Amino acid sequence: MVKEYKTITQIAGPLVFVEKTEPVGYKEIVTINLPDGTTRRGEVLDSSSDIVVIQIFEGTTGLDKECGVVFTGETLKLPASIDLLGRILSGSGEPLDGGPRIVPDQLLDINGAAMNPYARLPPKDFIQTGISTIDGTNTLVRGQKLPIFSASGLPHNEIALQIARQAAVPGSESAFAVVFAAMGITNEEAQYFMSDFEKTGALERAVVFLNLADDPAVERIVTPRMALTAAEYLAYEHGMHVLVILTDITNYAEALRQMGAARNEIPGRRGYPGYMYTDLATLYERAGIVKGAKGSVTQIPILSMPGDDITHPIPDLSGYITEGQIVVSRELHRKGIYPPINVLPSLSRLMNSGIGAGKTREDHKAVSDQMYAGYAEGRDLRGLVAIVGKEALSERDVKFLEFADLFEQQFVTQGRNENRTIADTLDIGWKILAHLPENQLGRIDNKYIQKYHPAHRKGQ
């Protein structure tokens, strides 16, 4: 027999406090019955004392102490089916595209669990995004978690959509899917995401979850877990390689802070909960490859750094959990460069596992290292030119200064719909490296220079 409690003691922000007489499970789903016959859903946040703390998904406006509370004994579940592909859903899994509700093959608990480290396989297969600054110098590897560090006003949404459209595991295109989850976005951004997915045809192999800024903060905490549960289902039940794009993790962390404040928790750094590191890890650590499974889950979380501060707790803690970072640069954006990705502070820690002969191309690492070194030197020389002028530079220094400009104009810059193969990316790299004297290409083996350098290829 289902019991209805009418023992609400307090309503504060998105939280309802209920006196209980029987044990209640953590994260148990609750139904709130209003006097007008409508219902709302909530989730148990704390059941350690006689007072249960419940967060309400639809907000607490209109609730009072006369409302009935029913504990369902179930956790929040995703209706999982292969029919998820091609659908646009709300942050809590409700259809936004006018289609029917998903008829589930399984109902999966969205809280999931981090992978057993013993069951993990090391990531080693290249994922092609079609963006040279990622594929060429900060390669994404299947099973990796590689965040994009951006900032307010920078085109991280455009970059996210371009990756969603273009990403593929070469040779496994038929088994590749994208799960895209946006948190705390405006209605305008939601329309932009929906129309882009529909116009470009990317929706056919994607599942999209959209949580709007005016949706309850509680739903923002649920959204990435819905997305990751969908990804795990497609990966481990249907053998697909799934790329999960989560944007914007900063909005997720703000929702955590808001919920912590509503519960009168003692805040940590800059007002964020002390458990934020652990909470972020429960999201990021759901990426990977499991022994015996055909599919995999790869993550690209996108976060906007408040005040462009890379030491802010959100990027700082994310950096400890993830395997590198792609940094979007305001300086390059001001120059009109798209995508404005700065390769110097960017890093993919698993890059060397996913490149080379049989994966990308034998010269990949050498070309990447040489371009990185040349661009770093050219950037340093720009600072020197600002002090002493270009006339004071040697002929060699001028070549590196010009190389930095070519790198930004030809390698970094590409169209929003330009999908470069890894061969295209490396060939562009060789084209701009040809601007440097051969005796300055010290990071590239001579056999690769003889095989791929434009000056030698012409004679072949």
From Swiss-Prot:
Subcellular location: Cell membrane
A Pfam family matched in the record: ATP-synt_VA_C
InterPro entries named in the record: ATP-synt_VA_C, ATPase_a/bsu_AS, ATPase_A1-cplx_bsu, ATPase_F1/V1/A1_a/bsu_N, ATPase_F1/V1/A1_a/bsu_nucl-bd, P-loop_NTPase, V-ATPase_su_B/beta
Keyword set includes Mitochondrion: no
GO MF annotations, alphabetized: ATP binding; proton-transporting ATP synthase activity, rotational mechanism
GO cellular component: a single term: proton-transporting two-sector ATPase complex, catalytic domain
UniProt function note: Component of the A-type ATP synthase that produces ATP from ADP in the presence of a proton gradient across the membrane. The B chain is a regulatory subunit.
Protein name, entry field: A-type ATP synthase subunit B
Organism whose genome encodes this protein: Methanosarcina barkeri
Gene this protein is translated from: atpB
